[in-house]
Amino acid sequence: WNDIHRGKRDLVVKLHTGEGKTLIGLLMLQSKLNEGEGPCVYICPNKFLADQVYYEAKKFGIKVSLITENNTFPNDFIDGNAILLTYVQKIFNGKTIFGLDNQYQKVNTIVMDDAHACLDAIKQAYTVRISRRRNESMYSDIVGLFEDVLKEQGEGTFVDIQENEDYESIMLIPYWALSLI
């Protein structure tokens, strides 16, 4: 990484379990901090793994900080003196402290540990499931609202969902469809 990929963006580090991905990610971020290129964030798929990474960083003398109990950023992270260690739900939610639009916390480099698990958690956080049996009126309203977009994805599946209450099909409403309503 240091010799060949240091200046590149959007890198994927792929190693087998137990081969040191966590330490490599922490060292990559530490090198960015050493060069004055902070703030840096290390994202884990869950709080349990974030706790493990915290202790591993401490074991190797890598300075990490955590979001405070009152949900604010520690100064050593903001100043680029420590890696912020957090988990995906802290970042991807409707009330993220990282901010939106012009009110946001600048971050220079991010390492996402176990990206597949993080992406699954993000997807789940932004997924709304409506049970036809428990919320028939709401279910019908949503299906009607997005009928054209859902038919474009697959008319047969749409008909199965519309006519057969026990069918186990799932159709996703694309994000861009929200701008059509």
What are these regions (language model features)?
Residues 35, 60, 94, 118, ...:
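Conserved, well-folded catalytic cores of nucleic-acid-processing
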